[in-house]
Amino acid sequence: MNKTIKTLIFCVIACVITSTAFAGTKVFNLSAAPGLALHDRNQKIEGLTLSLWGENPQTSLAIGFVNGTAGNSAGVSFGLINYSDTYKGLQFGFLNSSKKLKGVQFGAINIAKGKKTGFQVGFLNVIPSNKKWFSNFPNEIAPFMIIFNWRLEK
């Protein structure tokens, strides 16, 4: 094995061991599916999440094919699909969907359903709480828009 792979394996093992030392706080999660992970789907992760499909509330860097969160979450998510109830931070993916977003979504399709502050950059950007096209500019642009869209709290 080369040095980089050995270092990565060591870091993952150290994170797993350390995460069990702090009661109530988990710094690392590895997940194949919400029911098949190191930690229960209701356990908050504060650190790093690596997933095929993960669904934990988190304040972390989430890297996976599908990153889902229930409840309040924050951080940076890199995935093919990112979805959340309430998210504060950055979402990078093909499809990003958040019920309440306070942050930025970068992706082909971005959806932010709530009335929070959010910026979107992508092919199709949807913010249904923006009721009319350019009626409240510069605080909001449109219900849907190509290239970019946003909503700023008043």
Language-model-derived ranges and their functions:
Residues M1-I9:
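Bacterial N-terminal signal peptides that target proteins for export
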Residues V12-C15:
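Repetitive helical segments and hydrophobic/amphipathic motifs
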Residues T18-T20:
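N-terminal signal peptide c-region/cleavage motif recognized by signal peptidases
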Residues A23-K154:
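Surface-exposed, glycine- and small/polar-enriched segments that build interaction surfaces at terminal
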